[in-house]
C-alpha cells in the first residue's frame, strides 16, 4: 500500500480510510473486530470514528462512543499500525458536561 502524508502532520496514511459509523449496530463487535483486523492486515492504517458513532440505534442522551470502544479494543495490540481520526461532533448527553 502506498501511504500519503496527512497534511503537514508528518503522519502517513493509507489512501483508503475505514469508516466505523455502523460499528455497534448493525455491525456487532465481533464482526467489527474482524473487519478492523482485515483492514490492518491489508495495509489500511487510517480509521475514522467519532464520539457519536454507535450504529443506527443512537438517540439523544445515549452514551455514544461505541465505535470508539470497539476500535480501541480491536487495535490495542496493533496501536502502532493505525492512525485513528476521531472527532467530537455532537453532545452525547443532556448535561453541559456530557
What name fits each language-model region?
Residues 1-83:
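N-terminal binding-site loop/beta-alpha segment at the start of enzyme catalytic domains
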Amino acid at each position: 500500500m502506498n501511504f500519503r502524508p496527512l497534511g503537514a502532520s508528518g503522519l502517513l496514511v493509507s489512501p483508503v480510510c475505514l469508516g466505523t459509523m455502523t460499528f455497534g449496530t448493525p455491525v456487532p463487535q465481533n464482526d467489527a473486530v474482524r473487519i478492523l483486523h482485515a483492514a490492518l492486515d491489508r495495509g489500511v492504517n487510517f480509521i475514522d470514528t467519532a464520539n457519536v458513532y454507535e450504529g443506527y440505534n443512537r438517540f439523544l442522551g445515549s452514551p455514544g462512543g461505541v465505535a470508539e470502544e470497539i476500535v480501541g479494543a480491536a487495535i490495542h495490540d496493533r496501536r502502532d499500525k493505525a492512525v485513528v481520526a476521531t472527532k467530537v461532533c455532537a453532545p452525547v448527553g443532556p448535561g453541559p458536561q456530557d
